[in-house]
From Swiss-Prot:
Residues 1-34 are annotated as: Disordered. To E.coli YfdL and M.jannaschii MJ0347. It comes from Escherichia coli (strain K12). It comes from the Bacteria. This is Uncharacterized protein StfP. Residues 1-15 have a biased composition (Basic and acidic residues). Residues 22-31 have a biased composition (Polar residues).
Amino acid sequence: MHRIDTKTAQKDKFGAGKNGFTRGNPQTGTPATDLDDDYFDMLQEELCSVVEASGASLEKGRHDQLLTALRALLLSRKNPFGDIKSDGTVQTALENLGLGEGAKLNAATATLGRTGFIAIPVMIGGIEQSVIIQWGWNAAKASASGGDGNTVVFPVAFNNACVAVVANYDNVSAPINAVATGGYTTTSFLLRCAAQTGSYYYNWIAIGY
């Protein structure tokens, strides 16, 4: 591409080396800028190349091909990155951006409170799964033969398995009663304390997937 460079171009009109056009001035003997085939060929090919780069063929009767081509070649503000999806090149785009499998993962979900959970998406072998961490505060009832195993229901069910539950006594005052967990399923576990009388509360945290 080039700016007009005929002998009658207005030299440095837009700055050093940036020629422009002049309509001329007969009173001062300044001629109007001449146009040549080099300049018109440049304009033609610059514009036509944009249309053809979009995959379209030139049509003499159409006057919107340049605009149509620009919309096709540039990202649409109405549907950001929609062209990447429609071209079937999402994977290529992620690779070009240097993003790994994690870029495809959904956002983590959670419920916060005294009892709650967080589900963290992970990619394992190209398959999205979730590591789930849950927590709560529940009672373990005592009995004459030692604490009963109270069933505690998880805030949400694990998709595959619960692998561990850790509990601690929710009181620093004596007596401090030992606690145990067991009987893990995807929906619940057993919480048992060592006391033979009373009812004692324990904090717990569970991990699964």
